[in-house]
Amino acid sequence: MSENPFDLTGKVAIVTGTSRGLGQYFGRALARAGADLVITSRDPATLAPFQAEIEALGRRALPLPLDVRSSDSIQAMVKAAISHYGKIDVLVNNAGCNVRKPALEVTWDDWNLVLDTNLRGTFFVSQAVARHMIPRKYGRIINIGSVTCVAGYAGLGPYGASRGGVKQLTMSLADDWGVHGITVNCLAPGWFKTQQNAVMYENREWVEYLCDRIPLKRPGQPQDLNGAVVFLASDASAYVTGQTLLVDGGISTGATRALPKKVR
């Protein structure tokens, strides 16, 4: 074992949903810590630039197709990853989606899309990877959640429900697989600007409203997540499992939200 508990040299990490957004930041952070990667997307052709970026860091990156709503796709991805690397040490369940609508406008299909992707997908990818981790008595599973797992936001009903489910699932899987040396934790970002929500951050009034409610007075930057994902993927977190780590600038405290602005 390295003297540096955050060192991931020799580890293999799967990061789902790496065609854009936070998934790529998670992948970069793990690669810089020494891990080789499996990167996934429903269309693996979109992964070529990211693959090249990881390889430029001196790490390996295997691009694979993955639709987390398909059992066959999940099984094929895990089989290909093990065939290529021989093992899986770390899983980052990042693939997800959102439908932002008032509750009365949410359709049956909207609900199924979000829950099938964010919750069911997280479970069945974890299950498939755990089948390989259990005989090796080692594994780090990181489920990507959201501040919506602890706070309610209008227009995010299905999304919040899915992330709340991921938080609960994390605790259940941690209890189930801890005996096998597998830790399962949830990394829950707060409000971060990504390609998916960039249009929201063009509204200055909304950004001011948001920052007024964040104790650190700014939205998150993707690099703010680097330390958390490396911590949860590494031996530094060997005795941490079943936990949800909120990286949200403190917005989940609700404290500044309750005070008049002039008091703050």
Segments predicted by a language model, with ranges:
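Active-site helix of classical SDR
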Residues: 126, 162, 170
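Substrate-binding pocket helix/loop in short-chain dehydrogenase/reductase
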Residues: 102-103, 107-115, 141, 210
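Conserved glycine-rich cofactor-binding loop
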Residues: 12, 19-21
